[in-house]
Amino acid sequence: MGAYKYLEELAKKKQSDVNLFLSRVRAWEYRQMNVIHRASRPSRPDKARRLGYKAKQGYVIYRIRVRRGGRKRPVPKGQTYGKPVHQGVNHLKYQRSARCTAEERVGRYCSNLRVLNSYWVNQDATYKFFEVILVDPSHKAIRRDPRINWIVNPVHKHRESRGLTSIGKKSRGIGKGHRFNNSPQHATWLRHNTLSLRRYR
């Protein structure tokens, strides 16, 4: 078994003494830093490598914290116009994950880089911490590598803002299998392809 396999098994047991201690120390450390900051290396190298990271020039890791909880509707003085059923402000749930938000914010912060993927690293009562893998499309090492130079094409600019990353596709309901059988896309297809002859019509 290689070293990465051991790291993977360690990361799985989040309630172990080692992981609990590490997460508490790291959460404190991350809170002292800026909201978005560059990490010198991934804190989960096994996970980063599985998602496409390589320890070579052109690849960058940024760490970000996102506040946990629901999303309050941004309306001036709480004034929502319309019917009472649509007047909710406080108890609304954002339909995309915190990881999506993290990718978007890092993508705006590093607008000259391309977001490849991201992963969860830590969380506490207030924040969730993510690490985002970015690629420099103008770097020669990236442009000459046939495994990653697809991301250089202009069509991949700000792919995180258009739901084209892994987590972005998940929240769009695009996929196959039991997780996606009740997704909006599947429901729309079913609605359009089901003949419904109601009694009173």
From Swiss-Prot:
InterPro entries: Rbsml_eL15_core_dom_sf (IPR024794), Ribosomal_eL15 (IPR000439), Ribosomal_eL15_CS (IPR020925), Ribosomal_uL23/eL15/eS24_sf (IPR012678). It comes from the Eukaryota. SUPFAM superfamilies: Ribosomal proteins S24e, L23 and L15e. GO terms for molecular function: RNA binding; structural constituent of ribosome. GO terms for cellular component: cytosolic large ribosomal subunit; nucleolus; nucleus; preribosome. Residues 169-179 have a biased composition (Basic residues). One of its GO terms (biological process) is cytoplasmic translation. Component of the ribosome, a large ribonucleoprotein complex responsible for the synthesis of proteins in the cell. The small ribosomal subunit (SSU) binds messenger RNAs (mRNAs) and translates the encoded message by selecting cognate aminoacyl-transfer RNA (tRNA) molecules. The large subunit (LSU) contains the ribosomal catalytic site termed the peptidyl transferase center (PTC), which catalyzes the formation of peptide bonds, thereby polymerizing the amino acids delivered by tRNAs into a polypeptide chain. There are 2 genes for eL15 in S.pombe. Belongs to the eukaryotic ribosomal protein eL15 family. This is Large ribosomal subunit protein eL15A. It comes from Schizosaccharomyces pombe (strain 972 / ATCC 24843).
